[in-house]
Amino acid sequence: MMTLLRSFFVLTTFLFLSCNSSNEISKPNIVLFMVDDLGWQDTSVSFWKNETKFNRLYNTPNMEILANMGVKFTNAYATPVCSPSRISLMTGMNAAKHRVTNWTLNPNKKKPAEINHKIFEFPDWNYNGLSTLDSISNTIYATPLPQILKDNGYYTIHAGKAHLGAIGYPSSNPLNIGFDINIAGHAAGAPQSYLGVDNFGNNNSKNKIWAVPGLEKYHGKDIFLTQALSEEVLEKLQKPINSKSPFFLYFSLYNVHAPLMEDNRFVEKYKNIGLKNSEIKYASMVESMDHALGVVLKELENKDVLKNTIVVFMSDNGGLSAVAREGEKHNHNYPLKSGKGSIYEGGIRVPMIVYSPFHKTNIREINHPVIIDDFFPSILEFTKCEESSFVQNIDGQSFVPLLNNETVEKKPLFWHYPNWWGPIGPGIGSYSAVRQGKWKFIYFHDTQIIELYNLEKDISENNNLISVNTSKSQLLANVLTKYLKSVDAQMPYNKITNSIVPWPDEHPLFN
C-alpha cells in the first residue's frame, strides 16, 4: 500500500501542477482524522529533530504513509483537555473566547473537581457546550463548521467521539450542528467499553451515560470499537463517492482515550517485547487508530478520489500520563514535559499531518506554530468557503499559505484554563499562557507563579528564564493580558484573598 500511495501522490502532484491554472477542481473532499489523547510521540512518525524511544515503540505505518505523502507540522497545538479543542475546531474561536474551557457532559453543572474547591470559586463557564441558538444558557452561540460546509454543498459525515455539548442539549447530537450522518457520536467523551462483546458499554445500566450509541449491529461480536467505526465509515462514504458529491468526513476516534483496552488484532507484538499490562493495551490502541487511518486512505485510493481529497490528522490534546498508565507518571511524552491536563508542552503539543494534492510545496515539514483555532479558517479556505457568513468572530489564522511555502506572520498562540481538571502533576491546575515565536510564558492562577521558556533551546521546559529575561517576560505578560481582556476572559475567584485572580501583567515582578 505504501508504494501505491507514494506513486499515486507523485502522479497526482504532477497532474495538479499541470492543470491547476484551469481550476478544474472546485470543491475538494476533506477528511479530518481527529484522535483522542494521542501524544506528540505516540507514533513511529517523529515530530522532533531526534527519534525518541516512543517512536521506536509504537507502530503506525499509515501515519508514516500520510507523512510521506504530505507535510508534518512539528509545532502544532491543541488545548490541554478535549472539549475546548473540539469547540475551537468547530468555531475557529480560542477557548478564552468561547468559554467552553473544560470538558462537557452533565448539563448546567461544573466539573466535580471544580465544586467546593479549597482555593477557588471557578467561573460559570459554558459547560453546556456549543449552540446554534443565542438563547441557551452557558453555551457558545456560533455557526458550526459542518453547517457551513453543508450549506456549501458538502455531504457531511461524523464518526466517533462528538463531545460538543452536555446531555440533553442539541449539540450533543452532531446532526444538529450540520452533519448529515452521525455514527456513534453523543455527549460523552469516552466509551464505557471498546468491546463489541460488551455491547460497547450498553449492558451496564449504572454507567449508561458512557455507552456508545448506534452500533447495535455489532453488539455481541468480537470486534473493537475502532474497527466497527471504520466499517461504518466505509459504508457511509459510498453515497457521496458514487454521486461524486464533495464530502467532509470528520473521523473522530474514541481511541486512545481511557479505559485502556486491548485490540486483539494488534496486541501480540507488544506482549512479546515485555511491556506491562496497561502499556500493552495502550500500544494496541495506538496501532488500532493507525489501522483505521489506513482503511480510509485505501478506500479513497481504490475509489479514485484521493486525488481530490485533503487529509488532515490531529490530536485533541497531549498524551495521557497522569493516570491509567504504567511507568513513571508525567513522563510518557518525553522529551515534552507532563501530559494531558497540563499547560506544559506534553499537555498541548500534538502530532499533525496535512496531505493536500493542491498545494505547490516540496517541503515535508513545517515548524511554524499553529493551533486548533486555525483549523476552521483553513478548512474554509481549502473548500473555497471563505466568504461564508458566520455569527462568531474567529481567532484562527489559516495555515493554507504555509502549504504553498509562503511566509506567514507568527501570531501569538493563547491558552486559558480557569478551571480544575482533577489529577495532579507538573503544570496541571488553573492557568493562562502565550507562545510567541520561540518564547512561552505561563501564568499559574493558584500559586501566582510565572514561568518563561525558550522552546527552541529548551523543549522540555526545564530552565525557567523568568528572572533572567524580565523584559521578555513583561512583554509576553502584557500580550497575554491584552488578549484575555479583549475577549472578556473569565478568571477564577480566590477564596483566600477574597478577590478575582489578578491579570498576568499585575504580577509583582512587573510592578
Put a short name on every predicted segment.
Residues P170-G178, P259-E262, K298-H359, I371:
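Histidine-centered active-site microenvironments of extracellular/periplasmic hydrolases
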Residues L32-F33, W40-T143, I148, N202-N203, ...:
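Active-site segment of extracytoplasmic enzymes that catalyze sulfate/phosphate-ester chemistry
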Residues N23-P28, V35, W40, K72, ...:
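Long, internal low-complexity/basic segments
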Residues L105-Y155, A162-S245, L253-E262, A283:
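Formylglycine-dependent
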Residues F224, A228-I241, E268-T309, E326:
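A long, amphipathic alpha-helix that forms part
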Residues I30, D36, K161, V233, ...:
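A short aromatic-rich beta-strand->coil structural motif
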Residues I181, G319-E345, K360-R364, H368, ...:
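C-terminal cap/loop subdomain of S1 sulfatases and analogous C-terminal strand-loop tails that border
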Residues F54-T60, T74-V81, P107, A113, ...:
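A short beta-strand-to-alpha-helix junction
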